[in-house]
């Protein structure tokens, strides 16, 4: 095979000469440039070797063949460190290893914070409240820094160790045949060998530690909710201890307990919650109310302050108290089995959306529509808060209410269904 024939199939100038055996394995076809000049001839590719010749090819031969089959010409390719083992190369290797190890450290920190950091809300008592408030920021900080550190390490490795290469490829169509798969594997193997990662034990170990810790922390963070038993009865109620998901601040702790519908005052120089009477609301209005007991106090003592904080922070506590206009009462449709849950013109629905637990906090007075701004679910307050638009599939849970002997609005029992989004064990629809 002549050098002219070798040039005709586009051998990259960096590949060098070939043995007679190699020349016999790759049989050239017509020159692609001639086909382009003629305009009538299709672009030709090298004739493919048979299976025996393909199996006998070395990785470098497969690499060269793959380039020619794909119409790839390597214009430039040089290693980053022509001389191995220099001090500069070692410094570059250590800098990459540092970033990868940092990724592992932050990934391990994410795992430890998720497992052991105090995440449950407790009433403010100085230092413990501050530690609790750091839980979510620390999740995001350690997760983000772990990803960032590994990414910086990967980018630095590419810039400092992967050979510099400029390749030019002609556009063409082709299917993934056996020969294509073998040559692609050869290219990947060449890239792996050229990256010199095999002999860089420190970087390999650092990468393994970084990705391992990051992956473990991420896996535990996502699977943690599936590992913990959510049905452990820990909340004392009038019917015995129950799991957290079955309860809220409106759940009576003993038979006959009075739980008032209280509005938040938003002031610091007075009680944070005050009881409500029917005359405190205008017709058509909406008020957010919270569960308040006489034993919760007015916040003047440390114990009372803690209890009131728990009321305000309870995720299933906020309730929308809506007063229907007398002229619109005839349009009200009550839910089956809940016909007595309202007190005259007053209806109380949870503020926790039945879609994903977001706060459905917007209310349109003229149409009696309740809107969750997160995913645009809408509920009709005239039709037992049934969803009429958006992804929510269930009505908002309704709280039974009445009035006590002193004329204050009180809960007439607990929610008869879980508050918020669905879960597997839920049977109500």
From Swiss-Prot:
Belongs to the Rieske iron-sulfur protein family. Disulfide bonds join 358-374. Was identified as a high-confidence drug target. It comes from the Bacteria. This is Cytochrome bc1 complex Rieske iron-sulfur subunit. Keywords: 2Fe-2S, Cell membrane, Disulfide bond, Electron transport, Iron, Iron-sulfur, Membrane, Metal-binding, Oxidoreductase, Respiratory chain, Transmembrane, Transmembrane helix, Transport. Iron-sulfur subunit of the cytochrome bc1 complex, an essential component of the respiratory electron transport chain required for ATP synthesis. The bc1 complex catalyzes the oxidation of menaquinol and the reduction of cytochrome c in the respiratory chain. The bc1 complex operates through a Q-cycle mechanism that couples electron transfer to generation of the proton gradient that drives ATP synthesis. Gene3D superfamilies: Rieske [2Fe-2S] iron-sulphur domain (2.102.10.10). [2Fe-2S] cluster binds at residues 353, 355, 372, 375. Residues 316-410 form the Rieske domain. It is found in: Cell membrane. GO terms for cellular component: peptidoglycan-based cell wall; plasma membrane. The chain crosses the membrane at residues 96-116, 137-157, 207-227. Binds 1 [2Fe-2S] cluster per subunit. InterPro entries: QcrA_N, Rieske_2Fe-2S, Rieske_2Fe-2S_sf, Rieske_Fe-S_prot.
